[in-house]
C-alpha cells in the first residue's frame, strides 16, 4: 500500500513526509476496519480508498487559505482527516450529526495522534462556533445553494471562504446562488487514477 500511495503522490506532484504517509495509511486501515461494522463509506477496498478518499481530499490543500477550517457533513472524516494530516499547522473542526461517525473520528484522532482536529456531533443549523472560520469545506451538499444557505454563519466576515468539492458543475448551479454570495473561482482538480470531473468552487459573501 505504501508503494501505491507513493505512486499516486508522485503523479500528483505532491511531497509528504514519511510520518504523513504513515498516518494516511493508518487512516485507511482504520476506515476499512470500522467500515465492516459501521458502513461509513460505500468504498470497500483500501486501494480504492487511496484514490477516492485520500487523493481526492488532499489535492484540495494548495487551494485553501488560512489555518482554521470546518469540514461540514464530514462523514468518516472526508476531506477533513486527510487534510489535517497534510496540513499539520492548521486546525480542522469535523462536524457531523451521526454519533457513530463522531465515535470513529475520535478513535482515529486517538490512534493517529492528531492534535489538530476537533470532532463535533451537531447538525449544522444548531452549531454556533465561538468564532468564524477561515474556510468552510464540504463535499456533502447536493448543491452550492444548499451549502451557502446552511453554512452562511460559519466563515469569518470578509476574509472567510466557502470551499465546495464538486464533481460535474453546471452553469445553472453556479448561477443559482442565494443573494449575497459570489463565486470567486472554479478550479479543476486532477486526481490520479480517478475518472470523471472534480472541481473546487471557492465562494464568498458579498
UniProtKB/Swiss-Prot annotation:
InterPro entries: rRNA_ssu_MeTfrase_G, SAM-dependent_MTases_sf
Subcellular location: Cytoplasm
Disulfide bonds: none
Main EC class the enzyme belongs to: transferase
Signal peptide positions on this chain: none
Keywords: Cytoplasm, Methyltransferase, rRNA processing, S-adenosyl-L-methionine, Transferase
Enzyme Commission no: 2.1.1.170
Binding residues annotated for S-adenosyl-L-methionine, in chain numbering: 73, 78, 124-125, 139
GO MF: rRNA (guanine-N7-)-methyltransferase activity
Main location: cytoplasm
Pfam families: GidB (PF02527)
Any one annotated GO CC term: cytosol
Catalytic activity: guanosine(527) in 16S rRNA + S-adenosyl-L-methionine = N(7)-methylguanosine(527) in 16S rRNA + S-adenosyl-L-homocysteine
UniProt key word Cytoplasm: yes
Superkingdom per UniProt: Bacteria
Its biological purpose: Specifically methylates the N7 position of guanine in position 527 of 16S rRNA.
Similarity-based family: Belongs to the methyltransferase superfamily. RNA methyltransferase RsmG family.
Protein name, as recorded: Ribosomal RNA small subunit methyltransferase G
Taxonomy of the source species: Bacteria, Pseudomonadati, Pseudomonadota, Gammaproteobacteria, Enterobacterales
